[in-house]
């Protein structure tokens, strides 16, 4: 993976490889992840992407699939409910060998979590330095070099919340479907619209396509439904606003490890249904995102 700065004289009017024309990460070619089904989870910061990703990963594993979850946020907290700890990141372990990846062992950066889900935290450079996209690229490269992706059925990328260049876009190079986690409120739907726009732009260069919305912390979905109908989106699942979900995070556990109750069993069933639906395959969506003013006018009550 390399970076490139393109001077104005080099910029033509035709199509350019992704990353050209600005200071961005140019993605490697031929970086497809084996035969695994790959999902990238997006959404507004704090919306519950890591909770959603971890429970979805366990749901896939309950279906008998071999699952790998890759946390792509410098906070490196994507997998702690699976591993019960904050595991070392790829950047952490690369630093210990002076960035000589050939000296790393699999057990240095891949950790087994709940029900056999394999977990990796890409980590990231310190705030204001480096490129998150480079870190994700190095993580996938390491996994391929150690042949870990050859024995994986499902890969789940849990992506940082902000729409930025490298860190946001890197998982899209590898993903088959991008899923957006949102709640039934203005701020998270507004962010979802921006993410739809960004993914649509990246889909011109990658094979990734929108898969749909996962409604999280949502007892109702009236605003999400308005948004979906307007842009041609669909909802794949609805996770209600349950206190047991908050408690599961505090217990460093997934919902599949919580004491059984009617509401726990219901939300487990929702995740299992979602995993099965995604495994069976969802048709790609080609949505038309709204302008900021239009979404402002669309949402809310008269």
Curated annotation (Swiss-Prot):
Pathway assigned to this chain's UniProt record: Porphyrin-containing compound metabolism; bacteriochlorophyll biosynthesis (light-independent)
InterPro entries: NifH/chlL_CS (IPR030655), NifH/frxC (IPR000392), P-loop_NTPase (IPR027417), Protochlorophyllide_ATP-bd (IPR005971)
Residue positions binding [4Fe-4S] cluster: 131, 165
Keywords of the record: 4Fe-4S, ATP-binding, Bacteriochlorophyll biosynthesis, Chlorophyll biosynthesis, Iron, Iron-sulfur, Magnesium, Metal-binding, Nucleotide-binding, Oxidoreductase, Photosynthesis
Start-end of Polar residues biased regions: 1-10
Co-factor binding comment: Binds 1 [4Fe-4S] cluster per dimer.
Subunit structure: Homodimer. Protochlorophyllide reductase is composed of three subunits; BchL, BchN and BchB.
Name of the protein in its database record: Light-independent protochlorophyllide reductase iron-sulfur ATP-binding protein
Originating species: Rubrivivax gelatinosus (strain NBRC 100245 / IL144)
């Amino acid at each position: 993976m390399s970076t490139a700065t393109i001077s104005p004289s080099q910029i033509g009017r035709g199509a350019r490889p992704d990353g050209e024309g600005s200071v961005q990460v140019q993605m490697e070619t031929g970086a497809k992840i084996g035969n695994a089904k790959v999902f990238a989870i997006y959404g507004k910061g704090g919306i519950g992407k890591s909770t959603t990703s971890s429970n979805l990963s366990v749901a896939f594993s309950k279906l008998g699939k071999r699952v790998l979850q890759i946390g792509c946020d410098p906070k490196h907290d994507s997998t702690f409910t699976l591993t019960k700890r904050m595991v070392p990141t790829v950047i952490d372990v690369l630093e210990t060998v002076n960035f000589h990846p050939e000296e790393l062992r699999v057990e240095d950066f891949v950790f087994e979590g709940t029900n056999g889900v394999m977990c990796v935290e890409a980590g990231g450079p310190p705030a204001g330095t480096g490129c998150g996209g480079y870190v994700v690229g190095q993580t996938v490269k390491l996994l391929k070099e150690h042949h870990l992706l050859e024995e994986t059925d499902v890969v789940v990328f849990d992506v940082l919340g902000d729409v930025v260049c490298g860190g946001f876009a890197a998982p899209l190079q590898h993903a088959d479907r991008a899923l957006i986690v949102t709640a039934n409120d203005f701020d998270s739907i507004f962010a979802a619209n921006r993410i739809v726009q960004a993914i649509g732009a990246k889909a011109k260069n990658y094979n990734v396509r929108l898969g749909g919305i996962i409604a999280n912390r949502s007892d109702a979905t009236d605003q999400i439904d308005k948004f979906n109908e307007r842009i041609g989106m669909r909802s794949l699942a609805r996770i209600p606003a349950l206190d047991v979900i908050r408690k599961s995070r505090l217990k460093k556990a997934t919902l599949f490890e919580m004491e059984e109750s009617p509401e726990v069993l219901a939300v487990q069933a929702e995740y299992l249904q979602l995993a099965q639906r995604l495994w069976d395959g969802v048709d790609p969506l080609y949505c038309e995102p709204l302008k900021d003013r239009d979404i402002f006018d669309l949402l809310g009550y008269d």
